[in-house]
């Protein structure tokens, strides 16, 4: 679990997301509270439950991006799901319990990766010995068994030195590696993914682990052997328990498009994908026990962050019980022209930086001037105002249109420098932006 302070978390998010300080502060405090809770004594820790968050704001203002960046910062089991993918229990489709199963799977993967990293040094030594055994086969005794000499031979030491220095990287050897099972591919009916994954695991375990000889270059063989030896050093039962503990104590679930499962107005008849889904989410958010193939998982201390545009529905259209379980409300603001300018220049991997790097691969040097950036931002904002407002995503559309000619001719422009200023932007975009019909369909 990350021990970053709220100020450090916000500072890190500022590198990628412009504005939305309220949302950043809310997720930063929620993340820090996870760490604070773990410092309490066990009795009080059990009583402290996470304060779930509801993020409200139009599309393209950074809700999903905050979740994506938070996942990397958290160093904790994290999953992002779309509320629209689930249906009420009893109907064909994914049940909400699969959220916790997927979260547990991601935790298993994360914990296994950490365990392999911890054992990497020992695994590298064992892999090195296996390669040396192939290069210099050990002597055998009268019973045909390998003899372990008291001291390694000078030839073995010489090969070890060459191996570590990379002199043997391109030499090809034949070595026994664990055979990768092709498995049995089972097409999962909707809502039965859990059962089919268990069947696949059962078929894969039949016959046990087999060794298969493969011819590889030493450099490639070393990588595969290190992974194989590290996996042997990992205790699978301990790994499962560690992953379940990580999910229960530090897990974070981000539910996007929560507004799409709101019941709008009075309607009769079954509402499979809306109110029923909300009711199924209630026990997860409140705290229940979910059965997974790795064991039982309690959801009492999992943090839930829900988000939605709420353009047609409003947060009050959520069922009252779910509203009560999302106590922290954060409203994200629509983006202005100034925000667009900052989005184009401030993030460490902004869209303009990406385009410069892409064109640089063809030997074309692109320069964006401040007035050019302002003009692009103004064009994107104007199209958002006249057509559908899709927030920062509009910048991708506008820039792609602006760079189309350069991208097409880039291979013929090797060694040239192109400056994108206000005049260049006006020449390529003004006509499209001014014509509402054209901008609606092209930008």
Curated annotation (Swiss-Prot):
Signal peptide from the UniProt entry: none
Localisation: Cytoplasm
InterPro entries from the UniProt entry: AAA+_ATPase, ATP-dep_Clp_protease_ClpX, ATPase_AAA_core, Clp_ATPase_C, HslU, P-loop_NTPase
A Pfam entry, by short name: AAA_2
Taxonomy, superkingdom: Bacteria
One Gene Ontology cellular component annotation held by this UniProt entry: HslUV protease complex
Gene Ontology BP term (one): proteolysis involved in protein catabolic process
Entry keyword Nucleotide-binding: yes
Region Disordered, annotated ranges: 139-158
Alphabetized UniProt keyword annotations: ATP-binding, Chaperone, Cytoplasm, Nucleotide-binding
Statement: the UniProt record of this protein carries the keyword Nucleotide-binding: yes
Molecular function per GO: ATP binding; ATP hydrolysis activity; peptidase activity; proteasome-activating activity
Binding positions for ATP per the UniProt entry: 18, 60-65, 256, 321, 393
Primary residence: cytoplasm
UniProt similarity note: Belongs to the ClpX chaperone family. HslU subfamily.
Role description: ATPase subunit of a proteasome-like degradation complex; this subunit has chaperone activity. The binding of ATP and its subsequent hydrolysis by HslU are essential for unfolding of protein substrates subsequently hydrolyzed by HslV. HslU recognizes the N-terminal part of its protein substrates and unfolds these before they are guided to HslV for hydrolysis.
Record-linked HAMAP family: HslU (MF_00249)
Subunit record text: A double ring-shaped homohexamer of HslV is capped on each side by a ring-shaped HslU homohexamer. The assembly of the HslU/HslV complex is dependent on binding of ATP.
PANTHER family: ATP-DEPENDENT CLP PROTEASE ATP-BINDING SUBUNIT CLPX-LIKE, MITOCHONDRIAL-RELATED, ATP-DEPENDENT PROTEASE ATPASE SUBUNIT HSLU
NCBIfam families to which the protein is assigned, alphabetical: hslU, PRK05201.1
Name under which the protein is recorded: ATP-dependent protease ATPase subunit HslU
Gene this chain is encoded by: hslU
């Amino acid at each position: 679990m990350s021990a970053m302070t709220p100020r450090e978390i916000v500072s890190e998010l500022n590198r990628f997301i412009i504005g939305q300080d309220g949302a950043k502060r809310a997720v930063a405090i929620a993340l820090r509270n996870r760490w604070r809770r773990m410092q309490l004594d066990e009795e009080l820790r059990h009583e402290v439950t996470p304060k779930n968050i509801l993020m409200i704001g139009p599309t393209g203002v950074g809700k999903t991006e905050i979740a994506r960046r938070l996942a990397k910062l958290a160093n904790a089991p994290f999953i992002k799901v779309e509320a629209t993918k689930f249906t009420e229990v009893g109907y064909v489709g994914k049940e909400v319990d699969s959220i916790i199963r997927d979260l547990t799977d991601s935790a298993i993967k994360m914990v296994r990766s950490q365990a392999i990293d911890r054992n990497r040094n020992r695994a590298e030594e064992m892999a090195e010995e296996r390669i040396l055994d192939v290069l210099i086969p050990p002597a055998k005794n009268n019973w045909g068994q390998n003899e372990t000499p008291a001291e390694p031979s000078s030839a073995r030491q010489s090969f070890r030195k060459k191996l570590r220095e990379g002199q043997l990287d391109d030499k090809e050897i034949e070595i026994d590696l664990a055979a990768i099972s092709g498995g049995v591919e089972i097409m999962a009916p909707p809502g039965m993914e859990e059962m089919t994954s268990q069947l696949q695991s059962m078929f894969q375990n039949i016959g046990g682990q087999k060794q298969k000889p493969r011819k590889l270059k030493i450099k490639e063989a070393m990588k595969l052997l290190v992974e194989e030896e590290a996996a042997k050093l990992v205790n699978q039962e301990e790994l499962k328990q560690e992953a379940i503990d990580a999910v229960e104590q530090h897990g974070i679930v981000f539910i996007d498009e929560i507004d799409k499962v709101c019941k709008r107005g009075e309607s009769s008849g079954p509402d499979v994908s809306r109110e029923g889904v909300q009711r199924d989410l209630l026990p997860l958010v409140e705290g229940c026990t979910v059965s997974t193939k790795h064991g039982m998982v309690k959801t009492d201390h999992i943090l839930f962050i829900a988000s939605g545009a709420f353009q047609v529905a409003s947060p009050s259209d959520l069922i009252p019980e779910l509203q009560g379980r999302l106590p922290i409300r954060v409203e994200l603001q629509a983006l202005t022209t100034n925000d667009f300018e900052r989005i184009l220049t401030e993030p460490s991997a902004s869209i303009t930086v990406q385009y410069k790097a892409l064109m640089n691969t063809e030997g074309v040097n692109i320069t964006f001037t401040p007035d050019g950036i302002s003009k692009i931002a103004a064009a994107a904002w104007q199209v958002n105002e006249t057509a559908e407002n899709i927030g920062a995503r509009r910048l991708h559309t506008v820039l792609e249109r602006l760079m189309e000619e350069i991208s097409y001719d880039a291979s013929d422009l090797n060694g040239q420098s192109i400056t994108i200023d206000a005049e260049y932007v006006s020449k390529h975009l003004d006509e499209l932006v001014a014509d509402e019909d054209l901008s609606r369909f092209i930008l």
